[in-house]
């Protein structure tokens, strides 16, 4: 999946106020009564009113081939809300809607189109508020405290469905085959699409479409659906409905990156920082019973304990996986934090990354050449930096207007309090010593001869993750760093944005009139003692990067206020999220992987043991989406990420890449 800005819809509104695509010369919905047509064709054609009360699972998954104005989604959301109100004790509690859109509407056009349906306004306004920026890939939107999830995939549906992870196979309960008419948009209505629909459909899953075109009916039958005609809506004579009445054989395309979940719904999380806090929320939302074990006497005493941390994406022209992950993680994080019903100090003031030397200027120029949407990142010339940031630096750079800063410690503490209100159990001063399989679960041995057993375990304990026999071979490393807390000055108080250079400097937090400046970097160290050298170096790096800035020289670190923490990182700068891989079994099973890919078995992992680690210095950006990915995987639900990016997050990735090339693998 190439990283490029998605092209917005090219449309106009006709005399009836209906949006019409200029490119496809077709309406987005019926001039007569688009809302009733949606109810008849898609909700009625899939028999959803009758199926919801009898659905045997807590989640119902709908997929759609063209999002357009979101009419189908909004109509279904309204119907689902009405169902939940009428059937509060039903097994079905959550709706998951997956849709693909090559040319998404601009937010203003979306709002204008929604004026047609005032009865949908309560739902339409929520969609407009979370409408994502035009970036390729999956945008997960959470509504109604997670009872409704929308996965919006921006890009060509035929390309995107070929890039979906195998974990989405046979997950879709109902398909809405929608879009511009086949005669207007033949490129979408392909046999490849029909085959993808069949691959994703659950046995017994259904489909409905407004068209009755013969090639569509025959193509869906060839793909595996049993098809029938039904009376069309209004003046349309016929439409098509279908059922997946068979279980298609679906071999795993990349078994070495296969992800497995669990049906046990009970887990222990080891940790006490932002990763474990956000994962707790994500699992509780899915009905899990969760117990958190924290080694310290309180949360956020490790790497998540800083006063201020910057939120902005990590981009690189030469690393597609990095771009795909962090651009979508960043936009998800902003939506997630804005929705969180907890208080924490933050300011979405923007982040400006400056080119202080030739190397950093070249890196920024490469990022700006990637055709990024202006909502994500824009160039800023040296003479405009002072106006944007409030301070003079004599450097040009790149600005992330949606970025900013937040207090990780406060966020972590308050998210855990929220999770406790939802049923989370927390055990402090529980230092995990080791874990082993017992019966159908895990036996946890803690310091002080304390024990516990759990069905599923997630290791989210930062740099301590590799201290167990199951994880000792993981290629992760510790990084100790010191952040200095400096009092504001009249000049520093002018700083309006987070500055990033060969370090970073935050605007003052109004709650304490202090800034954060940092951070030192000591790879392989776990030393958390205060360092006067680090304190001075944090100040000196700022001065060295902006030698003409008098305000930088006035930075005062003499009061020795600082915080030292230890991060867990990987050499490819991406987190490790998923099953804990079995190192020894991987080397045995994949000894001949380079020559025998076709014979490869599923990735050797420890059953019901997962990990959420190596967030590095971008945990505030990556943690919300990673928590959502892991909770979805564990719950065997659709994952909001394409297969190749998921592979880049797999904890076994560095070993497997070498084995695929026939190279030797070393532990650590």
Curated annotation (Swiss-Prot):
GO BP, sorted A to Z: methylation; tRNA wobble uridine modification
Gene3D superfamilies reported for this sequence: D-Amino Acid Oxidase, subunit A, domain 2, FAD/NAD(P)-binding domain, Vaccinia Virus protein VP39
Localization, UniProt: Cytoplasm
Record keywords: Cytoplasm, FAD, Flavoprotein, Methyltransferase, Multifunctional enzyme, Oxidoreductase, S-adenosyl-L-methionine, Transferase, tRNA processing
Catalytic activity: 5-aminomethyl-2-thiouridine(34) in tRNA + S-adenosyl-L-methionine = 5-methylaminomethyl-2-thiouridine(34) in tRNA + S-adenosyl-L-homocysteine + H(+)
Signal peptide: none
Reported function: Catalyzes the last two steps in the biosynthesis of 5-methylaminomethyl-2-thiouridine (mnm(5)s(2)U) at the wobble position (U34) in tRNA. Catalyzes the FAD-dependent demodification of cmnm(5)s(2)U34 to nm(5)s(2)U34, followed by the transfer of a methyl group from S-adenosyl-L-methionine to nm(5)s(2)U34, to form mnm(5)s(2)U34.
Region (tRNA (mnm(5)s(2)U34)-methyltransferase): 1-245
Molecular function via GO: flavin adenine dinucleotide binding; oxidoreductase activity, acting on the CH-NH group of donors; tRNA (5-methylaminomethyl-2-thiouridylate)(34)-methyltransferase activity
Gene: mnmC
UniProt cross-references to SUPFAM superfamilies, sorted A to Z: FAD/NAD(P)-binding domain, S-adenosyl-L-methionine-dependent methyltransferases
Enzyme nomenclature, EC number: 2.1.1.61, 1.5.-.-
Superkingdom of this protein's organism: Bacteria
Family: In the N-terminal section; belongs to the methyltransferase superfamily. tRNA (mnm(5)s(2)U34)-methyltransferase family.
Cofactor(s) essential for the protein: FAD
Region (FAD-dependent cmnm(5)s(2)U34 oxidoreductase): 270-668
Annotated Pfam families: DAO, Methyltransf_30
Gene Ontology CC terms, in alphabetical order: cytoplasm
UniProt name for this protein: tRNA 5-methylaminomethyl-2-thiouridine biosynthesis bifunctional protein MnmC
């Amino acid at each position: 999946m190439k990283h490029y800005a998605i092209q917005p819809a090219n449309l106009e509104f006709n005399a009836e106020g209906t949006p019409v695509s200029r490119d496809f010369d077709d309406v987005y919905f019926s001039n007569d009564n688009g809302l009733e047509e949606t109810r008849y064709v898609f909700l009625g054609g899939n028999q959803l009113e009758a199926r919801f009360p009898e659905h045997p699972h807590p989640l119902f998954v709908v997929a759609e081939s063209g999002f357009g104005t979101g009419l189908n989604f909004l109509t279904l959301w309204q119907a689902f809300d009405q169902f939940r109100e009428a059937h509060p004790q039903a097994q079905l509690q959550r709706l998951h809607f997956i849709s693909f859109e090559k040319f998404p509407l601009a937010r203003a056009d979306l709002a204008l189109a929604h004026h047609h349906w005032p009865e949908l306004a309560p739902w339409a306004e929520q969609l407009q508020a979370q409408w994502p920026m035009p970036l390729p890939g999956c945008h997960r939107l959470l509504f109604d405290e997670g009872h409704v999830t929308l996965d919006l995939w921006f890009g060509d549906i035929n390309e995107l469905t070929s890039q979906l992870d195998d974990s989405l196979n046979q997950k879709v309960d109902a398909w809405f085959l929608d879009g511009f008419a086949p005669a207007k948009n033949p490129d979408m209505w392909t046999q490849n699409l029909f085959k993808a629909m069949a691959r994703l459909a659950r046995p017994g899953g259904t489909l409905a479409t407004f068209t009755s075109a013969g090639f569509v009916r025959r193509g869906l039958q060839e793909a595996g659906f049993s098809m029938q005609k039904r009376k069309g809506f209004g003046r349309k004579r016929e439409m098509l409905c279908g059922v997946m009445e068979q279980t298609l054989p679906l071999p795993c395309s990349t078994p070495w990156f296969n992800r497995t979940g669990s049906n046990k719904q009970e887990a222990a999380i080891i940790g006490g920082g932002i990763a474990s806090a956000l994962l707790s929320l994500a699992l509780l939302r899915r009905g899990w019973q969760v117990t958190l074990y924290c080694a310290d006497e309180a949360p956020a005493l490790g790497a998540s304990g800083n006063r201020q941390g910057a939120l902005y994406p990590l981009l690189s022209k030469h690393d597609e996986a990095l771009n795909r992950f962090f651009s979508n993680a960043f936009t998800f994080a902003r939506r997630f934090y804005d929705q969180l019903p907890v208080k924490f100090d933050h300011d979405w003031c923007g982040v400006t990354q400056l080119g202080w030397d030739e190397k950093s200027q070249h890196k920024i120029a490469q990022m700006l050449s990637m055709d990024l949407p202006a909502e994500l990142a824009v160039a800023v010339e040296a003479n405009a930096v002072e106006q944007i940031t409030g301070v003079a630096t004599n450097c040009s750079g790149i600005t992330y207007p949606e970025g900013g800063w937040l207090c990780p410690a406060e966020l972590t503490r308050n998210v855990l309090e929220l999770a406790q209100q939802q049923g989370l159990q927390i055990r402090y001063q529980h230092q995990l010593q080791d874990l082993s399989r017992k019966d159908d679960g895990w036996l946890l041995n803690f310091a002080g001869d304390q024990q516990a057993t759990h069905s599923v375990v997630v290791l989210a304990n930062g740099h301590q993750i590799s201290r167990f026999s199951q994880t000792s071979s993981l290629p992760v490393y510790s990084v100790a760093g010191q952040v200095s807390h400096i009092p504001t000055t009249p000049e520093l108080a002018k700083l309006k944005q987070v500055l990033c250079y060969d370090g970073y400097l935050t605007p003052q937090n109004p709650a304490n009139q202090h800034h954060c400046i940092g951070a030192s970097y000591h790879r392989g160290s776990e030393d958390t003692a205060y360092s006067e050298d680090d304190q001075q170096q944090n100040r000196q790096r700022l001065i060295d990067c902006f030698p003409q800035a008098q305000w930088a020289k006035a930075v005062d670190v003499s009061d020795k206020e600082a915080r030292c923490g230890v991060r867990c990182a990987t050499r490819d700068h991406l987190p490790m999220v998923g099953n804990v891989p079995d190192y020894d079994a991987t080397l045995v099973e994949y000894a001949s992987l380079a020559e025998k890919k076709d014979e490869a078995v599923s990735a050797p992992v420890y059953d019901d043991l997962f990990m959420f680690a190596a967030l590095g210095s971008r945990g505030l950006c990556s943690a919300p989406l990673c928590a959502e990915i892991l909770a979805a995987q564990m719950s065997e639900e659709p994952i909001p990420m394409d297969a190749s990016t998921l592979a880049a997050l797999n904890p076994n990735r560095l070993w497997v890449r070498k084995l695929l090339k026939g190279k030797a693998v070393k532990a650590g």
